């Protein structure tokens, strides 16, 4: 006979660790803005995006949605004791500057701002021009 399975386990919660210094990774695309706040080793402490804070469709790509997402991610990270972040910005989207300003206004001290947008060395063909 097969071994009997145990009763349903409780989901294991990770204990909250104190992270005073971290990194904020802002990925701003044409359709959305995603903010991930990590500890110095790269483990995600908190995250938020335009869709996560309640925006749908084309409203996710607005600077206002990026600001709200950054504020939400900062509040969650500050519950872990985060005080200072180094910001890494990636992508061409409209929410880049607004997200950085929202991190500052939420109470996080911004140490440095680095643009890590990847540059293609003549890689894939770009999308065709829009005709409106």
From Swiss-Prot:
UniProt-annotated stretches for the region Disordered: 1-24
Listed Basic residues bias regions: 7-16
PROSITE patterns, sorted: RIBOSOMAL_S11
GO molecular function, one term: rRNA binding
InterPro entries found in the cross-reference section: Ribosomal_uS11, Ribosomal_uS11_bac-type, Ribosomal_uS11_CS, Ribosomal_uS11_sf
Keyword Transferase: no
GO biological process: translation
An annotated GO cellular component: ribonucleoprotein complex
SUPFAM superfamilies xref list: Translational machinery components
One Pfam family this sequence matches: Ribosomal_S11
Keywords: Ribonucleoprotein, Ribosomal protein, RNA-binding, rRNA-binding
Subunit relationships: Part of the 30S ribosomal subunit. Interacts with proteins S7 and S18. Binds to IF-3.
Family assignment from sequence similarity: Belongs to the universal ribosomal protein uS11 family.
HAMAP family with a match to the protein in the record: Ribosomal_uS11
NCBIfam families hit by this protein: PRK05309.1, uS11_bact
Function, as annotated: Located on the platform of the 30S subunit, it bridges several disparate RNA helices of the 16S rRNA. Forms part of the Shine-Dalgarno cleft in the 70S ribosome.
Name of the protein this chain belongs to: Small ribosomal subunit protein uS11
Organism: Bifidobacterium adolescentis (strain ATCC 15703 / DSM 20083 / NCTC 11814 / E194a)
